[in-house]
Design a protein with these regions (language model features):
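A short acidic, glycine-rich active-site loop
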Residues: 268-269, 318-324
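Short, basic/hydrophobic alpha-helical segments
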Residues: 333-339
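Hard-cation-handling environments
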Residues: 300, 305
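Short glycine/proline- and charge-enriched loop/turn segments
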Residues: 309-317
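Divalent-cation-assisted or electrostatically stabilized phosphate/pyrophosphate-binding catalytic cores
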Residues: 324-330
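Metal-cofactor-binding active-site regions of metalloenzymes
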Residues: 2-290, 342-344, 348-360, 364-470
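C-terminal amphipathic alpha-helical interaction region
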Residues: 294-296
Length: 470
């Protein structure tokens, strides 16, 4: 019987173990998409206790706790103590078996704090006190944890109106880990609520110094901010969309739609889709001109529970996988850009695993050797799919229909400084997948050195470094 969470965790064969320990484990981390709070890195934030670093803002854990019958006050409440919240999490953990939370929890405790005990009500107090004491040491502050996990670069998620002051400070401090911004302009195309859109345009005008009265002014203001982001090291954009937008439109139509929504009038569904199409094309053109990589995270149905959304706001654990029909629109959108030679490097992340083969074949339509290997990427399993089963399905689809060897690999997509073991989890899963193929004679054992050096190390680190030019 294999042991849980030992040095060979998830590695079912000797070949998988060799690939992981000799190749994957030693590679630095490039976390090219995350939601860390930049201020925490700039200030080298010290976390008061284990709850502060582990439970705050973690909607994965909150969903599990709610499902386990835990009252909301122990998830997001303001009147419960940090220990009380942790105690309820510890009560929940034994019931998360076969959920990836069970693996992540114990990997994080082991790799960050050296804790090998299982977290449960009996061990909760000891583990909480031990980890909280360690968190007071400088090597467990925000920057210390990034050093501990050998993080070479992180890309945060930032709005075009953000000052990026914390990124600038980190750069000026000479911190070894590079913290780069990512351009996330979703609010600039969120025209569903005219008052909110107008308020955002006013912010954009203020920070860019461009007076906004017409659509062309919006693009000018965004160009100013795009160039500023580039000056601070930005190399990626990111777009959170339900589906791809690729409507036919004229410039006159977009000008009129902007005037309508900016004037406070509600748009029709057709007008909304046309405007979103135009904005995505403008964003894509900016990225192509700047040599950036654009990312598309699509397919989530957000804020399903209106009662809890009104109480807690977004990103609190009430989102789910959508079932949008996206193939034709995705194809049309990329072709709109490619036929004018304006298609930048692109990473596509689907949330519904139904779309794995769709995305894996779509990326093959728009590869271009002028950009190097793997111009268009099938992104790693995202959100509900960034677990063993989801990652294996994504990699199997990519292997079958594309080139796994040119994959840029894993990212945390996380708000937590304890989430870097997700890279280890991915690397173990990758090595197990490839190692099992070698053991079964599906790949030549004589090529194990090439596989380890070129493919495993490439996917874990080198492909991303070459792709993003960090």
């Amino acid at each position: 019987m294999k042991q849980f969470n030992d040095d060979n965790f998830l590695l079912q064969t000797e070949t998988a173990q060799r690939l992981y320990h000799d190749h994957a484990a030693k590679m630095p981390i490039i976390d090219y998409h995350c939601h860390l709070i930049p201020e925490y890195v700039a200030s080298d934030h010290r976390f008061d206790n284990l709850s502060k670093i582990w439970l705050e803002g973690d909607h994965y854990k909150w969903r599990a706790m709610r499902t386990n019958g835990v009252d909301e006050k122990y998830c997001t409440g303001k009147d419960t103590t940090d220990w009380e919240k942790f105690e309820k999490w510890a009560e929940t953990v034994p019931y998360t078996m076969r959920n990836p939370l069970y693996h992540w929890t114990h990997l994080e405790l082991k790799t960050a704090f050296g804790v090998t005990k299982l977290l449960n009500p009996a061990s909760a107090r000891e583990i909480y006190d031990h980890c909280t004491a360690l968190l007071q040491r400088p090597e467990y502050h925000a920057r210390g944890l990034m050093r501990r996990y050998n993080v070479e670069a992180v890309c945060t998620t930032d709005d075009p109106v953000d000052s990026l002051e914390h990124h600038i400070k980190v750069r000026e401090d000479g911190f070894a880990t590079r913290m780069l911004p990512t351009w996330r302009p979703d609010k600039a195309m969120a025209v569903e609520v005219p008052a909110d859109f107008r308020a955002y345009m006013e912010k954009l005008s203020e920070v860019s110094g461009v007076a906004i009265t017409k659509f062309a002014d919006v693009i000018d203001a965004l160009h100013v901010r795009h160039e500023f982001f580039g000056s601070v090291g930005c190399r990626l954009s990111d777009h959170g969309i339900e589906e791809f937008y690729a409507e036919d439109y004229t410039q006159a139509e977009i000008d009129a739609i902007f005037n309508k929504v900016y004037g406070g009038q509600t748009l029709t569904p057709e007008e909304i889709r046309k405007f979103k199409t135009a904005m995505l094309v403008e964003f894509a053109t900016m990225d192509h001109e700047a040599g950036w990589t654009q990312q598309f995270h699509y397919g989530a149905i957000r804020n399903n529970n209106s009662r809890m959304f009104g109480r807690l706001g977004p990103d609190t654990g009430f989102d789910s996988i959508g079932d949008f029909a996206v193939g034709r629109q995705m194809s049309k959108f990329f072709d709109m850009l490619d036929r004018n030679d304006r298609l930048a490097k692109t990473i596509i992340y689907n949330l519904n695993p139904r779309d794995n083969e769709l995305v894996a074949t779509m990326i093959g339509n728009f590869q271009d050797g002028r950009y190097g290997a793997g111009k268009i990427q099938f992104g790693s399993g995202w959100w509900f799919l960034d677990q063993k089963d989801g990652m294996e399905k994504q990699m199997n689809a990519l292997s079958t229909l594309g080139l796994l060897s040119r994959f840029v690999g894993m990212l945390t997509d996380s708000r937590s400084f304890l989430s870097y073991p997700r890279h280890e989890y991915f690397r173990r899963t990758l090595c197990n997948l490839v190692g099992n193929d070698i053991e079964q004679g599906l790949l030549p054992a004589s090529e194990i050195d090439f596989i380890g050096r070129e493919i495993i190390e490439g996917i874990c680190y080198r492909n991303a470094k070459d792709y993003f030019k960090f």
